[in-house]
Amino acid sequence: VALKDVVATLTPRVQATVLRGMLALPEPVQRRLVGKPVVRDGQTLATDVQLSLWLQKLAKEPGAETLPMEEGRAALRRHAAAAGGRQPIGSVRDLTVADLPARLYVPTGAPATGPLLVFFHGGGFMHGDLESHDAACRFLAERSGVRIVAVDYRLAPEAQFPAAYDDACAAYRWVVANAASLGGDPARLAVGGDSAGGTLSAGVALVAAREGLPLAFQLLVYPASDGVRRTSSAELFSEGFYLTRAYMELANDSYMPAGGDFTDPRYSPLYADIPAGVAPAFVATAGFDPLRDEGEAYARKLAEAGVRVELKRYPGLIHGFLNIVGVGRSSKAAVAELAAKLKAALGG
């Protein structure tokens, strides 16, 4: 019986156990399993990432874009739970922020008042919630010593553009006004998120500068910034590396109303005018990510406008690495570095 046939018959829970076991193997053993390295655009795919993609292919998992919306959302939650693991944290409590569901993560040993990150999850504006990014938020908070409040903004297609943007801005304004109730120091507030959440975070940072709201730092993890142009990385990596062209097209069609303007800076921050006083940024991109080039273009735009920016490409990783801290060594190391950057910026 071929291995691919065995893997395809396993339940998702057992597949996750197999994945964790194989990703715990020494790198040379993983390399023998997956064969020669994948090299593209002068970059080599991390061995554990290559193994993960290989196992997903064997499992014949349908892409989220092929499923009915609610099934796709459930699949993301399921996969994130399997890949993120149960990360330790001092305490967690659910609350409401600007009439939106939210979750506060307080790291072990946190002082009564300290730095606070407002986090917006990824998922193409149509998937993702507090559960899908629970492990990532736990990991970031505990490793950085920074409180995190994750916000569950409205999703498309039920709530189309600019609903998510409006929710993100409202949530940040609420946090500024109520920081003390969360244990947040108003002088050490940050905003951050991954993918679509990175887009929202970039938008909030611009609003904060225009409105004079306190914001000390922005953490943008493989953000989408340009809904118009097709970049080189989008051509190179939109098949076979987790985030597909079909998924991105569905996300665009779900979130943006028919006839909408994809150059609207609330959707594509690359087209925004950068005001004075924008918070310093750390922009993380993945080498094998279709969104790589537009994320890096936004980092350059900020820098050209005088914003203090650090850009870091993780050349061997793929889109979504924030969600696999429980199984992937290379992804876990990258997210640990994100936590260190957050700690350094805010003094966690």
Where are these regions (language model features)?
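A glycine/proline-hinged amphipathic helix-loop "lid/cap" segment
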Residues: V1-L104, G347-G348
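Alpha/beta hydrolase fold serine-hydrolase catalytic domain that processes acyl esters and thioesters
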Residues: A2, P186-A187, A202-G348
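Short beta-strand-to-loop junctions in surface cap/lid or active-site-entrance loops
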Residues: A102-T113, L270-P275
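Short beta-strand element of the alpha/beta-hydrolase
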Residues: T113-G122
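Active-site glycine-rich loops that stabilize anionic/oxyanionic intermediates
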Residues: H121-H127, F288
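Short amphipathic alpha-helix adjacent to the substrate-entry channel of hydrolases
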Residues: E131-A150
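Gly/Ser-rich "nucleophile elbow"/oxyanion-hole loop immediately N-terminal to the catalytic nucleophile
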Residues: V176-V191
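Glycine-rich nucleophile elbow surrounding the catalytic serine of serine-hydrolase chemistry
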Residues: G193-G203
